[in-house]
Amino acid sequence: MKITKIFFHITNLLFLILYLFPGSILGFLLYNDLSKQPQVTPDFIFSSNHVYAFCVLSIVGLISYYNKKKYVIYYFIFLSVILEVCHLIIPNRSFQFSDLFGNILGVVISIIILNIYIYLGKK
């Protein structure tokens, strides 16, 4: 298995743990407070943290499984919805459309970035 695929699976697992944990592991590590979520940049209409997380993970997934990119895109869209719906039943978490929009926007941005990279590489 290529190193990019191993990296993708490890980051995907870490992402799932952080996303499904009841509270913020990063908030606990940085602020000693499970209820405080670190904010990379201010939110606009969507959650910027979710955009960054899904964008980075999607880029790694698309690079790792380039020949199956359609399935990777479906996986991340499905994962976006399922993880956000799971927040309905996880203590100290809540379903928010702004988070869901941020998740999907991160996937879309990663697709755009990859397509630009491919286009510029063909010139």
Locate predicted features.
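Bulky hydrophobic segments
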Residues: M1-S98, I104, V108-K123
